[in-house]
Amino acid sequence: MPLPGGLWWLLCCRRGFTLLHRDYGDGELSGDGDEDEDDETFELRSPSPAGGGRGSLDVTLTQPTRNGPITDRLQSWEETWSLIPDKGLPEDDPDVIVKGWLYREPRGGGARPWLLPRRAWFVLTRDSLDQFSSSGKGARRLGSLVLTSLCSVTGPERRPKETGLWSVTVSGRKHSIRLCSPRQAEAERWGVALREVIASKAPLETPTQLLLRDIQESGGDPEAVALIYRRNPILRHTSSALYAPLLPLPYEVSAPGPGYAPLREEAVRLFLALQALEGARRPGPLMQGVLQTCRDLPALQDELFLQLAKQTSGPAGPPGLPATQDPAALRYWQLLTCMSCTFRPGGAVRGHLLGHLERTEQALPDSELAEYARFIRKALGRTRGRELVPSLAEISALSRRQELLCTVHCPGAGACPVSIDSHTTAGEVARELVGRLGLARSRNAFALYEQRGAQERALAGGTLVADVLTSLTSEEVGLEDSPDSGWRLCLRLHGPLHPEGLSPEGHELPFLFEQAHALLLRGRPPPPDDTLRALAALRLQSLHRDFSPRGPLPLLDRLMPPPAPPREQPSRPARRPPPSAALLAGALWSPGLAKRRAERARRIGTGRSTESTAQVGGGGGGSTTAAVLGGWKRLRGMGQAEAMAAYLALAAQCPGFGAARYDVLELSTEPGGGAPQKLCLGLGAKAMSLSRPGESEPIHSVSYGHVAACQLIGPHTLALRVGDSQLLLQSPQVEEIMELVNAYLANPSPERPCSSSGPPSQDLSDTSPPSQHQVLEKPQGQSGCLRQLQD
């Protein structure tokens, strides 16, 4: 008959205590449980209370007595506590930091409604957290938790559905203790004290860290390094499971994130995932999952670097590496390549990894593994951290040590393919395209933009293009059925437009011409009607040369932006001025300018809404077509380059040309200034403005000449210094805003009112007579022509 499981466990523990008797006393502990154990004593050395001498403190190891025929052998937990010496009264211990009565959860985990928490006397010292049955002398010890630098504390938190008490959880290597108190202040006091004790502990080092130090110290001796690898299997490739992490990770009970286990358990799971790579039919998704885990749990990044260094060392250590012809043997190197292009290892791990790569290159200089080692070393020197893990396409390219192909659309030049890697920035791509198009000496600045339908966003110069491609690809997969799911990268004008001195033979003139047209079609606010008709005539002249009655009539929707639908403005109560009103009032931020713009926009909007109504009715749409065609006829003889230059000069005078809008939060600079206010920041060619969401008219505006400085003061906070005052704005796009504002500040332009006429387009002054708005509602015999345009 087999022995019960509990009895086997008891015998093993008893044998273990017998073998380790030297750690607990000087006497010989017998394994038979005779009466000699009841008289066993040993001496603890402690400072003498009198002077600096050392006295002795006798501690007796007592065994509980039992009556009846049952065995006198101790239960496991009783024998464990019998080997822990009693320190005497907690009040007499000078190392006590905090003590008091607290509730503790019963054994077996969380509290249950039918089992109430029990009170215990807790004592916190600089080495452990002990609990006793009472606060008096000779109290029985109920438990103890040794505190190290890896212990963690969570809370205080309240659990109304369980105990209704405030709890603080202390996690150790084997178990955790949850301290409960009905008062939040007391729970916070214990939490702070526990964290201070843990923070004061010296960092623990794992055996792997000690071996890494030995390898670093003997790095110049290959034989010594090889000997360390041969004697320590923890550093070599293995097909067995890993039961503990290689680096010291904190003990935790709660998961660090949704869907994850505690860190130490996740480290073991990562090693299992690495071993699964050898037989995976599609290793790409598995690699991406491992990278995403390290992205969500940064504490595991160095752990994974060490695990990969272990698995790429070969079963016998360097230079005994696995066969390079086996595809499964290369997958560890491929994942290490992806890791080196995504994360930056820590100091000690980085040094060990670089040494491991160097030894691999020296052992097999002409092998494929040496090529991977050289690629990884270069990547480690350039990697600065990624916002997103590589996509499947990037993982496939990195596994072959190849570059990615990125397509950038350039107005007037088509699609330009650009080769990038995991470290290429948007600024580098923009500079390469500017050099290709011959725009290096241009006065205009250009940048890379992310465009999706009618929405576009400037990319900061330091943005990694690989991260942008990954985010756009993932969003496109999630929006397959959306009409705006199409996206692309484009090179665009970034900052003020300088149309002067453009060469008719270069690429810059058609590049800016096509871009200006695309910007005007999405302009906010749209230019006046007379300017739109003049621009449409100039575009027709540049595309089709002189007007011909036999040619097809152009479509207005490709020449002019669609009219905005009429919107009624409901009556609103008077608002309290925003915090920026007092800051930016007077000469810097002019409310009078906003009023004039609002009145002008009201007149323009009324005229355009009337025209839109007339076009819907079918009576007055021909007036716009007739005006555009009339202006086109008067441009007979103008060359293509001349028409493009006139188009750019006229477009540059429009206040809404190239304007960018950003959603920002305005922060008050005064203490107690109130909650942040949601506003829209508009950056135009001549000035910047602040407006409320949903409104096209600004509440305040200021020219760039009054902006003294623009700088970052936080991760998402931008400071604009206007005169002697400061404006604080928060936005996730602060880097783009700062680059655009600094581009405008570096290229000041004289303030001038917007006009539909200018030196390059003086012959267009008759294309839109002043009485045009009065005759829009009257049919002018062009309904057939308009019908032909719509067809």
Curated annotation (Swiss-Prot):
Residues 1-18 form the signal peptide. Residues 594-605 have a biased composition (Basic residues). The modification Omega-N-methylarginine is found at R636. Residues 237-399 form the MyTH4 domain. Residues 404-755 form the FERM domain. SMART domains: B41 (SM00295), MyTH4 (SM00139), PH (SM00233). CDD domains: FERM_B-lobe (cd14473), PH3_MyoX-like (cd13297). SUPFAM superfamilies: PH domain-like, Second domain of FERM. GO terms for cellular component: cytoskeleton. Residues 29-71, 549-580, 593-623, 748-791 are annotated as: Disordered. Residues 549-559 have a biased composition (Low complexity). Keywords: Methylation, Phosphoprotein, Signal. Residues 95-199 form the PH domain. Pfam families: FERM_M (PF00373), MyTH4 (PF00784), RA_2 (PF21989). Residues 29-41 have a biased composition (Acidic residues). Residues 59-71, 754-791 have a biased composition (Polar residues). The modification Phosphoserine is found at S30. PANTHER family: AGAP003327-PA, PLECKSTRIN HOMOLOGY DOMAIN-CONTAINING FAMILY H MEMBER 3. This is Pleckstrin homology domain-containing family H member 3.
